[in-house]
Amino acid sequence: MKVVEVKHPLVRHKIGLMREGDISTKRFRELAAEVGSLLTYEATADFETETVTIEGWNGPVEVDQIKGKKVTVVPILRAGLGMMDGVLEHIPSARISVVGIYRDEETLEPVPYFEKLASDMNERIALVVDPMLATGGSMIATVDLLKKRGCTSIKALVLVAAPEGIKALEAAHPDIELYTAAIDKCLNEKGYILPGLGDAGDKIFGTK
């Protein structure tokens, strides 16, 4: 599995701001979208382009346009919604495919409860967004679902990843790509990433 830890200074700075314990909901939400935007820029760097001729202001002009499969952004509910706008900033025409999965706090296992995917998943590149890759369970379950629906090109975008989650995701889906703003130290006994960001969903939505 291709794993990319994006070490751009802007990404490192913004993730550092998100680690502040007393950060406001507004600020955390803004930063989640901003880092999501920067990760999208990195994850789409290998998209193929083709040269086409258009009618410019002073006659025909050759320009580059992205070719190949179209994109669907796949936020994992609910926290993934906080990164979605960052993707759409660059790819406003992307279809939105939603997957609802929550983690059982006792077993730490993923529990799926909702899905609404683009009808042509086999013809699209899926950019799956979820702030935290902890145990990897939710991401693995989401990729399982996307593959069952015919999607063969999948990139996962997360703010923070734990080594345990990366290992589990690679074992289950070695053919996908992972882009993360930070690879943290480990998981604690409750399955939270250390040092991590805390509960990203609560911080994005202002709940506890």
From Swiss-Prot:
Annotated keywords: Allosteric enzyme, Glycosyltransferase, GTP-binding, Magnesium, Nucleotide-binding, Transferase
GO biological process entries: UMP salvage; uracil salvage
Keyword Iron-sulfur annotated: no
GO molecular function ontology, one term from the record: GTP binding
Pathway: Pyrimidine metabolism; UMP biosynthesis via salvage pathway; UMP from uracil: step 1/1
Pfam families: UPRTase
Catalytic activity: UMP + diphosphate = 5-phospho-alpha-D-ribose 1-diphosphate + uracil
Co-factor binding details: Binds 1 Mg(2+) ion per subunit. The magnesium is bound as Mg-PRPP.
Enzyme category, top tier: transferase
The protein's role, per its UniProt record: Catalyzes the conversion of uracil and 5-phospho-alpha-D-ribose 1-diphosphate (PRPP) to UMP and diphosphate.
Family classification: Belongs to the UPRTase family.
Protein name: Uracil phosphoribosyltransferase
Biological classification of the source: Bacteria, Pseudomonadati, Pseudomonadota, Gammaproteobacteria, Alteromonadales
